[in-house]
Regions:
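Catalytic metal-binding/acid-base residues of hydrolase active sites
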Residues: 11, 38, 107-109, 151-153, ...
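Metal-dependent phosphoester-hydrolase catalytic domains
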Residues: 78-83, 155-262
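Surface-exposed cleft-lining segments at the edges of enzyme active sites
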Residues: 108-133, 163-168
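Structured beta-strand-rich core segments of catalytic domains in phosphoester-bond hydrolases
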Residues: 37-40, 44-113
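Short, Asp-centered acidic motifs that coordinate Mg2+ and/or phosphate
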Residues: 30-31, 145, 224
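N-terminal, active-site-proximal structural segment of metallo-dependent hydrolase catalytic domains
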Residues: 1-52, 58, 65-68
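Active-site-proximal beta-strand elements of phosphoester/diester hydrolases
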Residues: 2-12, 100-115, 147, 253
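Acidic/histidine-rich, metal-coordinating catalytic segments
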Residues: 142-156
Length: 262
């Protein structure tokens, strides 16, 4: 069975429910994983998405912050969640797909503005989260897909300027090394880069601060799709849908998707 899975940091699912609906109509992925839903579960507008055929869902919500959800046209089993760093914030949810593959949806902490764990508790939290994610991944077995906003652009080709961003949170060496440990410990493959290798530039996020985001094109690839346990994406199916950054009232992230034979 071929399944197309998309991931998108939507930056408030209630504010952008119609944007999500427009994406589902235009691209029709089988599964959409959302991050930064910024809503309690009971207030996520599931009925809007169910009306479009996405009647299966699992989610973890939080008022005004974080939040992850998986919307699907195919039946899902709730795979539970892990409370990384024991903070009670909604940053992970899992679902078991038909055939047994587990889908993990992550929203890794952004880490604040100062890349110093001594001076910045948010950055310390990010590094702790990644350490726990590394240990968690090493314990996993069986086929799995991991998607989400991992808030790190690991490669030089994943940022508009490697040199200028080396001391900017999301591309610092300590973060890149931590993410690489997570990937290695879990035996994960970066699907997007397997299909579209460096040095081709790839971005999935552009700051709201730019007057003209497209002209400036100062992007970063913060959103990822990984696989393990023999799962491979259909060659050539990986896409980053840049045009959605130009939508009315857009998220600062765009959808990333790939198709799998499961």
């Amino acid at each position: 069975m071929a399944l197309t899975i998309a991931t998108w940091n939507i930056n408030s699912v209630r504010l952008r429910a119609e944007l999500v609906a427009g994406f589902l109509k235009a691209e029709a992925p089988d599964i959409l994983c959302l991050q930064e839903a910024k809503s309690p579960v009971e207030k996520i507008p599931f009925e809007v998405f169910a009306a479009l055929g996405y009647g299966h869902a699992v989610a973890r919500g939080q008022k005004g912050y974080n939040g992850v959800a998986i919307l699907s046209r195919v039946p899902l089993e709730d795979g539970g969640h892990v409370d990384f760093c024991a903070k009670g914030d909604a940053r992970h949810v899992a679902a078991r797909l038909p055939g047994g593959t587990v889908l993990h949806n992550f929203y890794v902490p952004s880490g604040g503005d100062v890349p110093d764990p001594e001076a910045n508790p948010k950055f310390a939290h990010k590094l702790e989260f990644l350490d726990e994610m590394c240990a968690w991944g090493a314990r996993q077995d069986g086929p799995a897909i991991l998607v989400g906003d991992l808030n790190i652009a690991p490669l030089e080709a994943d940022v508009w300027s490697h040199k200028q961003l080396l001391k900017v949170v999301s591309h610092t060496p300590v973060e890149v090394e931590a993410l690489d440990r997570v990937r290695t410990a879990g035996g994960w493959t970066d699907v997007i880069r397997a299909h579209i290798p460096a040095p081709e530039k790839l971005y999935s996020w552009w700051s709201y601060r730019a007057r003209d985001w497209a002209e400036a094109d100062r992007g970063r690839r913060l959103d990822h799709i990984w696989t393990r346990g023999g799962i491979a994406a259909v060659p050539g199916s990986s896409r980053i849908l840049r045009d959605w950054r130009g939508a009315e009232r857009p998220s600062d992230h765009v959808p990333v998707l790939a198709t799998f034979e499961l």
